[in-house]
Amino acid sequence: VDTDNDRPTLARVYRSLRDICPDSWNLPGGRMPTGLGYDFLRPVEDSGINDLKHYYFMADLADGQPLGRANLYSVCFDLATTDRKLTPAWRTTIKRWFPGFMTFRFLECGLLTMVSNPLALRSDTDLERVLPVLAGQMDQLAHDDGSDFLMIRDVDPEHYQRYLDILRPLGFRPALGFSRVDTTISWSSVEEALGCLSHKRRLPLKTSLEFRERFGIEVEELDEYAEHAPVLARLWRNVKTEAKDYQREDLNPEFFAACSRHLHGRSRLWLFRYQGTPIAFFLNVWGADENYILLEWGIDRDFEHYRKANLYRAALMLSLKDAISRDKRRMEMGITNYFTKLRIPGARVIPTIYFLRHSTDPVHTATLARMMMHNIQRPTLPDDMSEEFCRWEERIRLDQDGLPEHDIFRKIDRQHKYTGLKLGGVYGFYPRFTGPQRSTVKAAELGEIVLLGTNSYLGLATHPEVVEASAEATRRYGTGCSGSPLLNGTLDLHVSLEQELACFLGKPAAVLCSTGYQSNLAAISALCESGDMIIQDALNHRSLFDAARLSGADFTLYRHNDMDHLARVLRRTEGRRRIIVVDAVFSMEGTVADLATIAELADRHGCRVYVDESHALGVLGPDGRGASAALGVLARMDVVMGTFSKSFASVGGFIAGDRPVVDYIRHNGSGHVFSASLPPAAAAATHAALRVSRREPDRRARVLAAAEYMATGLARQGYQAEYHGTAIVPVILGNPTVAHAGYLRLMRSGVYVNPVAPPSRAGGAFGIPHQLPSRPPTI
């Protein structure tokens, strides 16, 4: 009840049309759209398609004068079917792991089998009065039947702003829906309509009507067709199964029989036969208004002349002819097969807008609206229509925003990558571990799980000698240094670690930083400046790209490990101050850089080399000195960077090189100068880990054997997994949602791995890199 008006609005909701008198449902004066007519709703309810829960909304004045009518239904909707990047095979796989993935119950206002304005009104001026009442009733119904989302669908552009003004304060957000195709009929015959087209466009339409002469196909025009209902359902299912366009209804023989029964004199079926056998149909409907509606179609794709006959085009032309003969002013052609429909004279694509709201969570509301905008495919359009659509897309995106354009946090409101994973129930980041990381680890709520995703390659994070060294340093020095290394933050422990690292790598000097990421930022931003050129492998770690941007230098890429491409880049940049920046081992792929060729090219072209050995130190080379040492070119690397958070079981990083270079970084590397020093416990743990790793070389052999064992076993099972002689085994899956779902499924099954997607993984690949501390029997 709307009590804010002198004449209250009374709202009633019925669960079946059988409880409603047809005369009380239909609005007077031709205001009821065809699709919302009583008899047009009957086939959907009577056939039981899609297991819908039906609700029929009636808003009247207290004296019984009708104000508005709306068709509501509650339906389970698989949002994953709208994701164009998720193939049916991947979707099936995820559903097997997580049966409820992206499946929600929607309470929708609109029509299931056609596109039409969702709300019929006595007068357009009643919208502001009726729509809030409708939204309130939907809210209550959603609460009662457990619907996750509310959706008011298929709003016309001309009504959009008024709907927005009413629904946005109620928590709804807009999204572009599936676009429909209409043509305005202004001709007295099909021949006149074809005369509006060029010869090139007219000829295919005209010849499509020659199916009898060219292929021996006959067509029946039927007003009663219940006896053909099983055939119609079978032919329709062929279209649903094969169509690339999204279809959500699931029609059965009862639906077609009910259409014949309830829509006699207001529907027509064209049944195409070849040698007496039904091969295709087109079913159209019309009401008292000016619209002629193409409702459903089906075809046998195994029919021998299927492609050449183009019966869909022929049926469109027969429909246009019938619409003209009935003096209809508009032919509504639905939401699929845009390319063919746009060949019809006067055809235009019309955007439709959905208004969405989660029943309880505003974040889910925003996420769904963004996902719908992103996932629903837009048709390829002529330039004039395309420009209009682009304007609508931008307008809807702006109206989706919960924050104004000038607010810097608007980008936060616009993202839906991680909130989408949460909505789908496959978000697994930030798992909580409750114990030390060995070959297994205790996870909160999961218990003991196998650990196949860790940077502790040598398993030294729990080694007694390393743990005791860390504890002793804390007892001796305290928990932190409370200052920059440049000032009060340098301990004798730091100095001795720098000396040991320099000696370990055969370099004159080394300098510490608080993290590996900081080490790259500090070194590269100090060494490079505007006018310099940084040349990077396309698959370098994110920190190296961030460091290049921070430096202000120009930078360019060469294809991953493509030395011919690198040589061309060096020739093209001859005469500039240059440095090649490269990962020794690529953390997402497990591949090893061709450092020998890089060193040779750098010497030939007078270029410096900066190598990040983070994932190689401790694992590759003599005594674990890294890939450069393994390839015999460590002395030719101008700057060597490494981190302590991998093999050395701690945290922090360092840069090693000639003393003048290192001293320059000490005084100019912001990440070193303006950060607190490495905690004493971390420095001492690194000291101890270095000692243990050199004393126990079998640890390196074991981790590489485990990686090879893992890669071989996965490849044998058909996975794209390769062993590159490092501790990292990537499994490439090709889709981010699958990678995240697989990761969560494995974790809940007792195995931890790392899911990786851009920007962590470049090139659009998605996968699970296994970083192995485990022995083969555990694997």
Q: Where are each of the predicted segments found?
A:
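Active-site/acyl-donor-binding loops of N-acyltransferases
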Residues: D2-T9, V75-F77, P157, I166-C196, ...
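Acyl-donor binding region in acyl/amide transferases
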Residues: K53-Y55, D60-L61, L67, Y73-P174, ...
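PLP-dependent enzyme catalytic core of the Aspartate aminotransferase-like
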Residues: E468, E472, R476, C503, ...
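Short loop-beta-helix segment that forms the pyridoxal 5′-phosphate
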Residues: S484-N488, E498-A522
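Active-site phosphate-binding strand-loop segment of PLP-dependent enzymes
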Residues: T556, H560-V611
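Active-site PLP attachment segment
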Residues: D623, A629-Y664
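Conserved PLP-binding catalytic core of the aspartate aminotransferase-like
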Residues: R702-E708, R716-G750, G764-A765, L772-S774
